[in-house]
């Protein structure tokens, strides 16, 4: 995959629940600590090397940000780092929270 793709919240939720893809959250640490999707990996500049070393690069990665904008650049960047399939989740965390409010947790 040379270019990231977008994925709807519903499609992302289904792939995530089925274990078909990993979900990464690129929001700032305070926002992530205040609330995030259960099981989401907090991907930052500091955690990126460990993520790439531990993640099966053939397994799709779905990137979640605030509103679905920053995730596009992050998804494209992950492709340049060896991830084979990357998606930007449409609507981001805010839209996911409105659609599926009971799937979050805080630190």
From Swiss-Prot:
Q: Main EC class of this protein?
A: transferase
What Pfam family is a match for this entry? Answer: Rhodanese
Is the keyword Protein biosynthesis assigned to this protein? no
Record-linked Gene3D superfamilies: Rhodanese-like domain (3.40.250.10)
Annotated CDD domains: GlpE_ST
User: So which domain of life are we looking at?
Assistant: Bacteria
Specify the signal sequence span.
none
GO annotations of cellular component type: cytoplasm
Report keywords, A-Z. Cytoplasm, Transferase
- What is the protein name given in its UniProt record? Thiosulfate sulfurtransferase GlpE
Q: Which organism is this protein's natural source?
A: Sodalis glossinidius (strain morsitans)
Q: What is the lineage of its organism?
A: Bacteria, Pseudomonadati, Pseudomonadota, Gammaproteobacteria, Enterobacterales
């Amino acid at each position: 995959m040379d270019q990231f793709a977008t994925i709807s919240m519903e499609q992302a939720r289904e792939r995530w629940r089925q274990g078909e893809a990993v979900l990464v959250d690129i929001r700032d640490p305070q926002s992530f600590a205040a609330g995030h999707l259960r099981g989401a990996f907090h991907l930052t500049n500091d955690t990126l090397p460990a993520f790439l070393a531990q993640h099966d690069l053939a397994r799709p990665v779905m990137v979640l940000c605030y509103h679905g904008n920053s995730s596009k650049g992050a998804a494209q960047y992950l492709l340049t780092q060896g991830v084979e399939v990357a998606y930007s989740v449409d609507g981001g965390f805010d839209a996911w929270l409105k659609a599926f409010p009971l799937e979050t947790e805080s630190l």
